[in-house]
Amino acid sequence: MPHIIVKIAEGRSQPLKQELADRLAATMMDVLGLDSSAVSVAVEDVPMQDWMQQVYGPDIETAGERLLKRPGYGQLASPPEE
């Protein structure tokens, strides 16, 4: 029963967020071999000026080994790809 929570900078249209949710759900079903009834997706808009305090600090910096894809900004930035 996976539930995906996506936090994005506000300003995306509802159709774009729906497409994102549909694609994420489809990938989750494909990779984990799940039925669509098992997957749910929520999209949270975050004001850009609040991103570091509301998302980066509590969700990214404290994730430890759970953070499987690092961002390209902030203290935990991944090294540039060559």
Curated annotation (Swiss-Prot):
<dbReference type="InterPro" id="IPR014347">
    <property type="entry name" value="Tautomerase/MIF_sf"/>
</dbReference>
<dbReference type="Pfam" id="PF01361">
    <property type="entry name" value="Tautomerase"/>
</dbReference>
<comment type="similarity">
    <text>Belongs to the 4-oxalocrotonate tautomerase family.</text>
</comment>
<dbReference type="GO" id="GO:0016862">
    <property type="term" value="F:intramolecular oxidoreductase activity, interconverting keto- and enol-groups"/>
</dbReference>
<keyword id="KW-0413">Isomerase</keyword>
<dbReference type="InterPro" id="IPR004370">
    <property type="entry name" value="4-OT-like_dom"/>
</dbReference>
<dbReference type="GO" id="GO:0005737">
    <property type="term" value="C:cytoplasm"/>
</dbReference>
<dbReference type="InterPro" id="IPR017284">
    <property type="entry name" value="Tautomerase_PptA"/>
</dbReference>
<feature type="active site" description="Proton acceptor; via imino nitrogen">
    <location>
        <position position="2"/>
    </location>
</feature>
<protein>
    <recommendedName>
        <fullName>Probable tautomerase XF_1725</fullName>
        <ecNumber>5.3.2.-</ecNumber>
    </recommendedName>
</protein>
